[in-house]
């Protein structure tokens, strides 16, 4: 039986995407209109066969072959079309500028049409049926719009059904039992071990009991240095990006743990030998450090209390499934649950083997389907798998569980399948930055901001992540400050399923072992269009990669090692995505051949060792994302090439340039994120036209800057949400601050109305900034660092800062008195008061802020310390705060920490 809920395949999504490209750009195909029209008609006919072909691919090898050929045809056609459009944009009236001109392109398109006709003939001979369609993209577009209209529950989806009672018990074991080394949570994959550990880690009692907390995911192939470095960075943020030798890391960890109480979580340890490799970092238990382990295996740590979560009872399974699959009851007026659907759901739940992850995934799959017919198809598929596959009723048999996981993938719309397969390209337990991921998806054409009025690439990615979280396929939570999903992870079982699907679809190739058959030297013959490299040791400076069809190349070093790249990109002509984070280049020069990659839409050189960028970068006119936050410790030669990159949405510039020519950025009208915009290297007036900016980091220099001009520019940025103003490292304002800074902030009307985050560093304001800032009604984060204000008195008035969530006051050397009136900052959650040397007391008004959950205080002033300590005369003002940290965060090792973005405080 054809599985109607599975027809939105990866192949059909690719065909739809190509058809959409041809339709949207039709007017630009001058001279080849006839061939383009024929190709569109052929694609429409082809789409009609895909539903039946996809339904038969599991049992018919020839059907699978047809789908693979269609995928290759789609890729080849897209390459031809994009070359035409890119070359044609240089000279709209003439195609003589690229080989063969119109005639060659026409022949290539005709060849594609012939290949489509041939594969259609083969499918007809195989008995694959055609569906009548009104429009090639009608099904997928309607499905996508329906999915995105679906209302997502605002409740936490941690769904600790059956585990709630254990959280308090294990928290007490960690904070109340001084004799134990910690807790080891063991059991099957998908049992909820990590979910339980996270609930414990985030518990208020745990946060207030321990001086420091660290969380590290331990993959099957880990290095001890990387694990130790992650822990050290968690416990002492100043070492987060350091490159210390392993012995030094061990020594510093040993010293920290000798004197501080710390809880360290090791998530997903595989065997006891792994623990013994890591253990030398721990001193004998003096200060009270403890560990919390999760593992599929028992007896990982010989001295930990072992806790084994039980499988859910059948009643708990049903309760959990109801919470997810029937969530529409709460959100859709008049929604009625069919009794037959309830009966089927109960029966399907039995095949989840009482495993929480399987129940959640089944619930997410059912929740996305609205009709009895769709639910019957899912039920029949599960039952047929059990009958045909001979799945046993043994609860240790994972076959039916894996089938539920596989079904949850197959039930996704095609665009979400692409998204999920991309997530699988990252290493096990890897935390994926969603902002960067959103641009990778956009570069591959997965996201369609144009379909959603006013939406950005990041907005659409957030919608997609929300869908995957709702279906319990991705682990992520919205950030309390940004209301976005900032990072995400794949559950390891779901990742295993996705890797199998990626292999079936020839979606990507992962290189991990330099000695394997999948090494870099075999890439020229690879049919995969996407390559991910974990083991960067396979590269030497002489290696040049060759693959004429490769679209995406990601380097994700496991650990912190750098790698050398070759000098030639010419053999990778069709790349859309190139991630070179941490790469080293001969002589510090990025090869000029980078300019040959005219299809490139995503380029990252974050932390790369580069001192010279070639002028050929100007050829990369299709770039959406360009990250040049290079870590060379030297001045960087940055040519004036950005003015031609009109599609840019994200631009991160180096900290310091060696070039004297100003960068012209005024043409970048589509920019949404601009980092390290220097008033020395660029004209502030360029900002006037960047009206779509949402995030802006400005490096202030005193050379010719008029602050009125800057204020005027900022007032034009109506969509700006996140603003950081920081002095350039070599700026003259350190000697003569008044050459740059005005004594007060501009009036409220000069600030962007949507501003949610503002960070001021070394601004030397003489007038209290709070009366202005508290009137910015969208502000959620305010950071005043290092003499941002140099006055004696600061006042937060009642009713001010209505949505403020986080306030950081760091290094205001002159501040003596701070008044917080009752009713000010009613939603404040986190407050940091750090190194304000003359501050006499904490504000009395803090006792009225019932929302305050975290207070960090660091000072060397003995009198102040005594006042705020437990039992001190000021303690009553803060005793209602669940988590109070003293002498935290630690002092940055040097001023470089100040300039991290968006915040130096972890």
From Swiss-Prot:
Signal peptide range: none
Binding-site list for ATP: 187-194
Superkingdom of origin organism: Eukaryota
Example of a GO biological process term: defense response to other organism
Coiled-coil residue spans: 20-59
GO function term, MF aspect, one: ATP binding
Domain NB-ARC, residue spans: 138-452
SUPFAM superfamilies assigned to the protein according to its UniProt record, in alphabetical order: L domain-like, P-loop containing nucleoside triphosphate hydrolases
Record remark on domains: The LRR repeats probably act as specificity determinant of pathogen recognition.
Family affiliation: Belongs to the disease resistance NB-LRR family.
Entry function: Potential disease resistance protein.
Protein known as: Putative disease resistance protein At1g59780
Organism: Arabidopsis thaliana
């Amino acid at each position: 039986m054809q599985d109607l809920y599975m027809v939105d395949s990866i192949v059909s999504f690719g065909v739809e995407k190509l058809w959409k490209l041809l339709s949207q750009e039709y007017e630009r195909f001058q001279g080849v209109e006839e061939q383009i029209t024929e190709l569109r008609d052929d694609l429409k006919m082809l789409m009609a066969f895909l539903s039946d072909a996809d339904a038969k691919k599991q049992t018919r090898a020839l059907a699978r072959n047809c789908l693979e050929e269609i995928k290759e045809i789609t890729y080849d056609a897209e390459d031809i079309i994009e070359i035409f459009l890119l070359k044609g944009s240089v000279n709209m009236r003439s195609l003589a500028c690229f080989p063969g001109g119109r005639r060659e392109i026409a022949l290539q398109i005709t060849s594609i049409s012939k290949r489509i006709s041939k594969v259609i003939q083969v499918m007809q001979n195989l008995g694959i049926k055609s569906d009548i369609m009104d429009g090639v993209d009608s099904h997928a577009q309607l499905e996508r719009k329906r999915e995105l209209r679906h209302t997502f529950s605002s409740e936490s989806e941690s769904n600790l059904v059956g585990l709630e009672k254990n959280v308090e018990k294990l928290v007490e074991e960690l904070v109340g039992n001084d004799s134990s080394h910690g807790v080891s949570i063991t059991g099957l994959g998908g049992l909820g071990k990590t979910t339980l550990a996270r609930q414990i880690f985030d518990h208020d009692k745990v946060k207030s009991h321990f001086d420091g907390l660290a969380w590290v995911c331990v993959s099957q192939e880990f290095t001890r240095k990387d694990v130790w470095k992650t822990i050290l960075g968690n416990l002492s943020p100043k070492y987060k990006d350091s490159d210390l030798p392993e012995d030094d890391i061990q020594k510093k960890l040993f010293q920290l743990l000798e004197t501080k109480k710390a809880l360290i979580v090791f998530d997903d340890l595989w065997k006891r030998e792994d623990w013994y490799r890591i253990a030398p970092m721990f001193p004998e238990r003096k200060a009270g450090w403890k560990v919390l382990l999760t593992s599929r295996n028992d007896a990982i740590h010989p001295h930990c209390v072992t806790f084994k979560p039980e499988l859910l009872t059948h009643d708990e399974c049903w309760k959990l499934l109801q919470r997810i699959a029937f969530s529409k009851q709460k959100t859709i007026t008049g929604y009625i649950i069919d009794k037959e659907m309830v009966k089927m759901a109960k029966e399907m739940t039995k095949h989840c083997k009482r495993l929480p992850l399987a129940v959640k995934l089944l619930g997410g799959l059912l929740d996305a389907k609205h009709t009895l017919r769709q639910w019957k198809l899912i039920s029949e598929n599960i039952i047929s798998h059990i009958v045909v596959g001979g799945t046993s009723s043994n609860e240790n048999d994972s076959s039916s569980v894996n089938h539920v996981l596989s079904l949850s993938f197959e039930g996704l719309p095609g665009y979400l399948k692409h998204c999920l397969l991309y997530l699988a390209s990252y290493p096990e337990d890897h935390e994926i930055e969603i902002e960067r991921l959103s641009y990778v998806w956009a570069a591959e054409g997965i996201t369609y901001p144009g379909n959603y009025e006013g939406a950005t690439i990041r907005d659409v990615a957030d919608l997609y992540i929300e869908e995957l979280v709702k279906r319990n396929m991705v682990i992520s939570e919205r950030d309390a400050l940004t209301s976005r999903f900032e990072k995400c992870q794949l559950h390891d079982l779901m990742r295993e399923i996705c890797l199998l699907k990626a292999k079936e679809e020839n979606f990507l190739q992962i290189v991990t072992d330099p000695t394997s058959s999948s090494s870099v030297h075999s890439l020229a013959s690879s049919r995969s269009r996407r390559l991910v490299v974990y083991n960067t040791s396979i590269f030497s400076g002489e290696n040049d990669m060759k693959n004429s069809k490769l679209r995406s190349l990601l380097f994700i070093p496991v650990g912190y090692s750098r790698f050398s790249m070759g000098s030639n990109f010419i053999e990778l002509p069709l790349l859309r995505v190139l991630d070179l984070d941490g790469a080293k280049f001969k002589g510090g020069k990025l090869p000029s051949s980078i300019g040959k990659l005219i299809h490139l839409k995503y380029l990252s050189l974050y932390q790369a060792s580069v001192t010279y960028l070639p002028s050929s970068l100007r050829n990369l006119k299709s770039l959406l994302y360009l990250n040049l936050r290079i870590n060379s410790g030297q001045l960087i030669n940055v040519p004036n090439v950005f003015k031609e990159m009109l599609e840019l949405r994200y631009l991160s510039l180096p900290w310091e340039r060696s070039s004297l020519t100003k960068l012209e950025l005024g043409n970048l009208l589509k920019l949404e994120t601009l980092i390290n915009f220097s008033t020395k290297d660029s004209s502030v007036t360029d900002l006037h036209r960047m009206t779509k900016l949402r995030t802006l980091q400005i490096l202030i220099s005193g050379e010719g800057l008029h602050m009125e001009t800057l204020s005027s520019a900022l007032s034009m940025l109506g969509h700006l949400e996140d603003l950081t103003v920081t002095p350039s490292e070599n700026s003259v304002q350190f000697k003569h601050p008044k050459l740059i800074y005005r004594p007060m902030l501009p009036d409220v009307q000069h600030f962007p109305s949507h501003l949610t985050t503002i960070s001021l560093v070394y601004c030397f304001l003489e007038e209290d900034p709070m009366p202005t800032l508290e009137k910015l009604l969208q502000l959620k984060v305010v950071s005043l660092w290092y003499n941002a204000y140099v006055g004696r008195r600061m006042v937060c008035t009642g009713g001010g800062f209505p949505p403020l969530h986080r306030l950081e006051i760091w290094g205001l050397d002159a501040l003596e008195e701070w008044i917080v009136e009752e009713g000010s900052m009613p939603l404040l959650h986190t407050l940091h008061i750090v190194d304000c040397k003359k501050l006499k007391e904490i504000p009395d008004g803090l006792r009225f802020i019932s929302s305050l959950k975290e207070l960090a205080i660091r000072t060397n002033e003995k009198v102040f310390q005594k006042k705020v300590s437990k039992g001190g005369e000021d303690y009553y003002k803060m005793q209602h705060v669940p988590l109070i940290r003293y002498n935290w965060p630690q002092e940055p090792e040097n001023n470089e920490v100040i300039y991290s973005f968006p915040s130096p405080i972890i």
